Amino acid sequence: MSSGWEESEFVFCDLQTAARYIRRDNPQAARAFLEAAYDSFEFLARNPGLGRKRADLGFPDVRVWRIAGFRRYLVFYRELPDRVQIWRVLHGARNLHATLSD
């Protein structure tokens, strides 16, 4: 079991971009999105093997989890020996292969 989680250098920007987009229509939903994202990070730190592996995206060590209440947003993460690394948070409609390869 991992002892916590860490964010990659991409996560802050991913979360802010998504929250700004959501805020245009519903400021309360944007706050709820950020809370749900961080709740997901904590959940994954306690249950790192639950996400689905997505080797089809070219990253065999990356797992994917949907954010509760915002199921179109995906958390991409890696299970490390002592923690979970939250790698990206992206909308599922994006070209995931191209975005993750950048």
PLM features per residue range, with description:
Residues 1-62, 97, 101:
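Basic, Lys/Arg-enriched alpha-helical interface segments
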Residues 67-102:
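Enriched for short, Lys/Arg-rich terminal
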